[in-house]
Amino acid sequence: DGHMSMLLAAAQIIKEQQLVKRGKLKTLFQPAEELGSGATSMIRGGAIDDVEYIFGAHVRPFEEAENGQASPAIHYASSCRMVIAFHGKPAHGARPHLGINALDAAVQAVNAVNAIHLKPTDNYSVKATRFLCDSGVTNAIPAEAVVTWDLRAQYNKTMDELCAKFLPAIEGAAASIGATVEIRDSFRIPAAELHDEATALLAESISAVLGESNCVEPIYTPGGEDFFFYTIEKPSLKAGFFGLGCNLRPGLHHPDMSFD
């Protein structure tokens, strides 16, 4: 609601003061950012077909930018959700040798993924965030387990490398005890690809409006943002993304979040 209100108010001021002297300005009220599907729906609707520059904004917690400050660039990371089902073979708990324990396969896979290492200078993480396994009773070998992983990487190339190691790790771990794997869900959001010219324009604008001292350093965050599907779909776009300080406390997505 805050972001929509900001853009609506800015659009009203731009129109009333007739600030657009040449060209055309579009204001994109994009839905479903948190689901990761909003930008792609706008693309399918033709919203960026005739666009050369595209700018996004996101409010920032007070630790990153105080009220009245803004950053000309937010370097969002790539994020990926992987939901993997492990299939074994059911058996009675008294006869485990007749079954294949899907829970064991999933545990092996979690440990295998935790052993993935990329270059220490790369900013990345991969961790299991959900583990579901229930045969319905406590004296049976479970035939299925489902694990969800959250993958993060600051750059798209790093995410490519992480994904390339992830799947062989889980497949090998499961195969080591005779289990198989099934990808139930996979969804990836690209990392930021910001254009130098667009970022420079934002820095110039922030300095002009808020003062040069209130134009803070670029922000690097492990969070994801589906805005960057725009540049994936249309590489010629000059994209910029700025962060706005607004006394946001105690933090983004907190149930008690407030901002000015």
Residue ranges and their predicted role:
Residues 1:
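Active-site cofactor/substrate anionic-group-binding motifs, chiefly glycine-
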